[in-house]
Amino acid sequence: QRGDSDDAVFMAAGNVDDGSRLQESRLSSAVDGTGSASSVMSWATKGDVKGVSAASCVTPELEQRFLVSGTKTGMTQQLVVANPSTKATSVDIKIWGAGKSGALALSTGATLVVGAGKETVMNLAAAASDQDALYVAVSSDDTPVAAVVRTVAMDGLTSKGSEYTVPNNTMSTTLAVAGLSAGDSASLYLFSKADAEITVSWT
């Protein structure tokens, strides 16, 4: 579909109940303002994942990195890796925790096999338990993959919500975090490949 105004937007929606989906866009023309974008959203009114989770869709890459909240009691972190190609691939996982320097020795192994057109889920809480925060690196040698981290928070039997974390592959010397209001309780997670001094300010 082609449009010549800001209101000319084509939208498609559908249910995804049995695994990841691949979107492929082929534009008949490439002019300023054309393109495609996708997002995913899930919601539930009861159960362990009660609430709303949303994220932009992920572009397959050979390497993807995540900075996520930890694996203390009540927090479940699931790494979901999808392989859109026509051949299986092996994916290497490295995880750093908040307690010490260097990558952690994982309790569940550090390699995932993802079948062609399939997805594989790794329980990060089982692989690196009792951590205040995790930095996760996902690497595929030959085939680009798409990955997200699905977080579920529980307080005993009470659901505290769920969320998706998408890859954050860019490091910077200056970052700004929006979306906080006066009185909010917030935790800041930082990762550096080398020793560094960090200055945090609020405005």
Indicate where each model-derived feature is located.
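Extracytoplasmic low-complexity, Pro/Thr/Ser/Ala/Gly-rich segments
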Residues: 1-35, 169-175, 179
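An N-terminus-focused feature that recognizes amino-terminal "leader" regions
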Residues: 17-23, 32-38, 44-45, 59-66, ...
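Short acidic, flexible loop segments centered on an aromatic residue
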Residues: 81-103, 140-141, 189-203
